[in-house]
A protein has these predicted regions:
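Generic detector of bulky aromatic hydrophobic side chains
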Residues: 24-48, 69, 93, 98, ...
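Extracytoplasmic/periplasmic, Sec-exported soluble proteins
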Residues: 1-2, 51-55, 71-79, 93-97, ...
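Active-site-proximal beta-strand/loop segments in catalytic clefts of secreted hydrolases
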Residues: 1-3, 21-23, 66, 136-141
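Flexible, polar/acidic helix-loop-strand segments at domain edges
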Residues: 7-97
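Extracytoplasmic/secreted envelope proteins and their assembly/folding machinery
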Residues: 3-7, 11-13, 56-60, 79-80, ...
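Surface-exposed patches in mature extracellular/periplasmic domains of secreted proteins
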Residues: 1-3, 20-23, 94-101, 175-180
Length: 204
């Protein structure tokens, strides 16, 4: 199981430090219960808010929380937080220990990558700081559009494209094309959401 593999990897590096909010505890413990039942484990509940040293099972449970403000966006941020903290721990290990973590992961997860490809990628990944893991669109909101279902809406597309060019290319004076402007207007007309309607999901 990929889930169990990640939990085992977190345990191998000594757990991760995560700030758990009071509102998250109920859902976190529900997922811990599911984890224990599925994998025949006895992972303890998290009983208080604040900075916590989570073991593998607790960290996986934390990363599954979605039924709070922010929904899937907030869940993605929790997953990124766990991965970031895990890599901080991996950097503290010596080379042989690092290789063992990734080798064990390879043996227990489903992937199309070869083992050598994974190990080479791991060598590169541990050199990077994963603190800024925001995604496009930067300013957005969620809305149900009937037959189209739940959608992520850029607020607005033109504004997001300007931000993208500034962030990726360092272009502070980028002017969107007429095509981008046209699509941006169409999205506003169809959804009713403008750049002033972006929801703060706490990501970057």
């Amino acid at each position: 199981s990929n889930v169990k593999a990640v939990a085992d990897a977190v345990d191998t590096v000594g757990g991760v430090k995560i700030y758990v909010q009071d509102a998250e505890i109920k859902y976190l413990n529900n997922y811990i219960k599911e984890y224990n039942e599925k994998f025949n484990q006895n992972i303890p509940d998290v009983t208080e808010a604040g900075m916590q040293q989570l073991n593998g099972g607790q960290a996986v449970a934390y990363s599954r929380i979605r039924y709070l403000e922010g929904g899937d966006f907030a869940r993605t941020r929790r997953q990124q937080n766990v991965v970031s903290q895990m890599f901080q721990q991996i950097r503290k290990l010596d080379k042989d220990e690092q290789n063992k973590v990734f080798s064990d992961l390879y043996e227990t997860v489903d992937t199309d990558m070869s083992k050598s490809e994974l190990m080479n990628m791991a060598d590169v990944m541990i050199k990077y700081n994963l603190s800024d893991m925001g995604g496009f669109p930067y300013k957005k909101s969620g809305k149900n559009l009937g037959s189209k279902g739940d959608c992520v809406i850029p607020c607005d597309l033109e504004e997001n494209v300007i931000m993208l060019h500034k962030k990726v290319y360092g272009d502070k004076n980028y002017q969107p094309s007429e095509t981008v402007k046209d699509y941006s207007s169409k999205i506003v007309n169809e959804t009713g959401l403008t750049k002033d309607d972006a929801t703060d999901y706490g990501d970057k």
